[in-house]
């Protein structure tokens, strides 16, 4: 039985956010790197760097700070498709989170992308998670 690396990323970020940690360390795979790049581009995390320790690579992510307030952003990350129950959608039925304020991360034939990119490309895929 394999590990669910996507759920591990989301849980690590959620736990660090609730515990008011500034950084989170995630095991580096191709999928995790692509998801973290999307989170960085969309502004949910502030900085990412790759770290090597005993021939294993890790991604060290700095979480986004609130301006003019103490604490972190309240980011909600929800895993949708999981190894036991895959959820697929075509590009017309990709859900909109909070009227477009949140993002949906999809795994498509063109790679991992957000819901906006998938709608522009006109392709659907597996719905990995919701973030808002």
Curated annotation (Swiss-Prot):
- An example of a Gene Ontology BP annotation on this entry? translation
Record's SUPFAM superfamilies?
Ribosomal protein S8
The GO terms describing molecular function are: rRNA binding; structural constituent of ribosome
What are the annotated GO cellular component locations? chloroplast; ribonucleoprotein complex; ribosome
Output the Gene3D superfamilies linked to this UniProt entry: 3.30.1370.30, 3.30.1490.10
* Pfam short name (any one): Ribosomal_S8
Q: Which InterPro entries match?
A: Ribosomal_uS8, Ribosomal_uS8_CS, Ribosomal_uS8_sf
User: What keyword terms does UniProt attach to this protein?
Assistant: Chloroplast, Plastid, Ribonucleoprotein, Ribosomal protein, RNA-binding, rRNA-binding
Q: Which domain of life is it from?
A: Eukaryota
List the subcellular locations. Answer: Plastid, Chloroplast
Q: Does the keyword Ribonucleoprotein apply?
A: yes
- Describe its partners and assembly state: Part of the 30S ribosomal subunit.
- HAMAP family reported in the protein's UniProt record: Ribosomal_uS8_B
Family named by the database record: Belongs to the universal ribosomal protein uS8 family.
Quote the function comment for this protein.
One of the primary rRNA binding proteins, it binds directly to 16S rRNA central domain where it helps coordinate assembly of the platform of the 30S subunit.
Name listed for the protein in its UniProt record: Small ribosomal subunit protein uS8c
Source organism of the structure: Calycanthus floridus var. glaucus
